[in-house]
Amino acid sequence: MKTTITLITAMLLLLTTGEDALRAQTDVPPAGARYGVKSAIIKKSFYGPGGDREITIYIDDYGAREAEEDRMGKHQSLRIRNEKDKTEVVVDFSERTVNIGGWESKRQINYRHLKLGELERYGLTEAGTKVLLGKTCRVYKQNTWLKSYMVTVTHYVWEGINLKSDLKYDEVPGWEEREEVKSIQVNVDVPQEKFQIPRGFKVKDWRGR
């Protein structure tokens, strides 16, 4: 009896794994999709002069909805971007406040549909590839101004998703910010509360001002 149960369990596991693999192979992004995967949960750590942070990114509907959860000590915030209604919501859990503003995806670098002319406009140069947690990323170098400093940023992009960015201040040796990707889950169920405004928070809507 025990052997039979073990065989059944093994067969169910094999079927489940096969279904996941088939879904990943047949999941074709719609035309113009921001990202090449339907959903994802990405966890990474940030290290910089201003303090270390833990970041979790939630992606749904090929990037039409995206949320970035940021934790630094006791402070927690959530930034929600919705491409459909062109909004960006910033939730501060410490202050229990919500700020709603406009957001246009065209202001962000769309790596999946990056055109040759945009490389120059954004100050990007292609710098080969690198594998992060089994994902082959396109590497881009970017020279840009951050406040009054010239910085060099290295972006690691997979399926249009900027998995990590490392930043170095050109004029301040040793002063840098870097990210480390901890885990990548693809085509998973994303908690829908990550895209919702918490109840009981003070809401400020800045749109149209």
Predicted regions and their residues:
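Residues that act as N-cap/strand-start positions at coil-to-secondary-structure junctions
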Residues: 49-51, 73-75, 123-124, 149
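Extended beta-strand-rich segments in extracellular/periplasmic secretory proteins, especially
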Residues: 28-37, 111-164, 201-206
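Signal peptide-directed secreted proteins
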Residues: 156-209
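N-terminal leader/targeting segments and the immediate start of mature chains
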Residues: 11-63, 186-209
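Short, solvent-exposed coil/turn segments at beta-strand boundaries
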Residues: 34-39, 57-67, 79-87, 135, ...
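Short beta-strand segments that buttress and anchor functional surface loops
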Residues: 42-47, 65-71, 138-145, 164-170
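Sec-dependent signal peptide recognition
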Residues: 2-8, 20
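An acidic-aromatic
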Residues: 54-114, 168-181
